[in-house]
């Protein structure tokens, strides 16, 4: 006959084992649900879109015009073309992930004041642009805008500019062509870096439907490359920009400016940034 204490201990350990297994199962189930939700809504994190009606009227200082392209059925691409009074060329500006040209169009003055036109597209689902989102579609759209621009501007008078998410469009475009220069503000080597920084507890590599492998595309770039990044960037880790810079071919002119107190969206506020950008816009080198 078993000792009563043994029976009590056996029952206790069985209870603990059952509770532990039940807890682990519940945690695993919850983790799976979180992963599923992340996979389902990730576009809302990556692309913070703001739509505008086709009839919306922009109001910016200086001359500008709207450009509409329809490269495929059910796809409408929209951009603003800002004109400088005495032009040195055109900056093809790929903006960040949030808002629309209603917000980003204000940035054009930074270039037009220095004699550069600015062609600034909205991505699919942003502003007046329409179409189904995918990484391949965004890359194709960026190429369409570059091709359109080369019909109006010589390639050696085009600077491709990518701001944060916009680097994911700017780098492949520059890699496939021969613009005057490639300028990247707060860029990433790939989107996995940003995801790891924000969602490190999730299997982000398996869940992400967007990679934006700038670190691979930039190896094919033949024009000068200028990278600006803040060490305190809470969205795109500084180390990601370092990896991107390391991937730039040694055969091209390259420079990386680090801002010790810089965050993600404040780099234009630094005098050093403005000074170097003035040099780039003045010489393209």
Predicted regions span which residues?
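Short beta-strand/loop motif that positions the catalytic acidic residue
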Residues: 220-221, 227-229, 233
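C-terminal catalytic histidine-bearing segment of alpha/beta-hydrolase fold enzymes
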Residues: 243, 250-285
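Short alpha-helix in the alpha/beta-hydrolase fold that links the catalytic acid
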Residues: 107, 214, 223, 237-246
């Amino acid at each position: 006959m078993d000792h009563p204490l043994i029976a009590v201990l056996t029952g206790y350990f069985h209870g603990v084992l059952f509770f532990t297994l039940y807890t682990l199962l519940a945690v695993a189930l919850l983790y799976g649900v979180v992963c599923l939700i992340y996979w389902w809504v990730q576009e809302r994190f990556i692309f913070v879109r703001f739509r505008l009606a086709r009839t919306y009227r922009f109001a910016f200082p200086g001359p500008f015009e709207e450009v509409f392209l329809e490269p495929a059925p059910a796809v409408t691409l929209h951009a603003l073309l800002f004109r400088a009074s005495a032009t040195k060329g055109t900056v093809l500006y790929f903006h960040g992930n949030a808002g629309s040209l209603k917000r980003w169009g204000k940035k054009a003055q930074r270039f037009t004041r220095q004699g550069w036109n600015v062609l600034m597209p909205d991505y699919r689902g942003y502003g007046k642009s329409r179409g189904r989102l995918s990484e391949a579609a965004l890359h194709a759209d960026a190429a369409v805008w570059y091709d359109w621009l080369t019909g109006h501007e010589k390639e050696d008078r085009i600077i491709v500019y990518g701001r944060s998410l916009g680097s994911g469009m700017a780098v492949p475009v520059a890699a496939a062509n021969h613009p005057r220069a490639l300028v990247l503000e707060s860029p990433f080597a790939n989107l996995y870096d940003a995801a790891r920084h924000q969602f490190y507890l999730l299997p982000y590599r398996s869940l992400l439907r967007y990679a934006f492998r700038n670190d691979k595309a930039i190896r094919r770039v033949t024009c000068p490359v200028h990278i600006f990044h803040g060490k305190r960037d809470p969205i795109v880790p500084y180390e990601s920009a370092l990896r991107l810079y390391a991937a730039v071919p040694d055969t091209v002119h390259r420079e990386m400016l680090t801002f010790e107190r810089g965050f993600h969206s404040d780099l234009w506020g630094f005098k050093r940034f403005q000074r170097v950008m003035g040099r780039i816009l003045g010489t393209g080198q």
